[in-house]
């Protein structure tokens, strides 16, 4: 094995694990490692990633611009730095708008549709007043939409919802899901290119990270007039 493209879900607290990964390149038989999605450059691991803080901020700011003032969050596990960064972006957008960051507006899932559904049910049962929902991934957002439908909470007229990732499911959901686009095909392509450069010794000296630009994809969970086109590519 000459190289590994790693998409790790290990806790950010597992510092020893990340240091051991970084040490592979210094071993007798060098094994180069590229991290996908997570920025592990502080450990000396080349990372191809997006700015999750910015993504969380863009998502929240957009909901605010659409008239939402009580935005609930469906987060992934607390131990993941990707989710932490998205939550920090959410908080920053609220504070920029002069709004209070309220932890009672946050529920946690495990990235699955079921966990998003159950998290949304908890928010509803707790009597939390909300007019927007930021889900830290698309799969949980689908669960959010199901829970809202069961409780006759109309989307988007009463509550607007935004996800994160722009996976295929976001374009086929009903209503279709507004989300933050993470160009996963581009990310994988760059990771393979950079790993090849590392193996061949052509990677520029000092280069340790590559950030992929993200963007907002507007669909009908925030604007009923948006096209509900199914995306047949890049999924």
Locations of the language-model features?
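Alpha-helical recognition/docking segments in bacterial nutrient-uptake
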Residues: 1-61, 125, 235
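Periplasmic-binding protein-like
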Residues: 1-11, 32, 72-74, 106, ...
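Short beta-strand/turn micro-motifs composed of small residues
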Residues: 8, 37, 49, 75, ...
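Helix N-cap/beta->alpha junction signal
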Residues: 8, 52, 83, 137-138
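Alpha-helix capping/helix-boundary segments
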Residues: 11, 40, 79, 86, ...
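Hydrophobic alpha-helical segments within soluble ligand-binding/sensing domains
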Residues: 44-73, 88-92, 113-122, 141, ...
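An alpha-beta-alpha
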Residues: 57-99, 104, 204-222
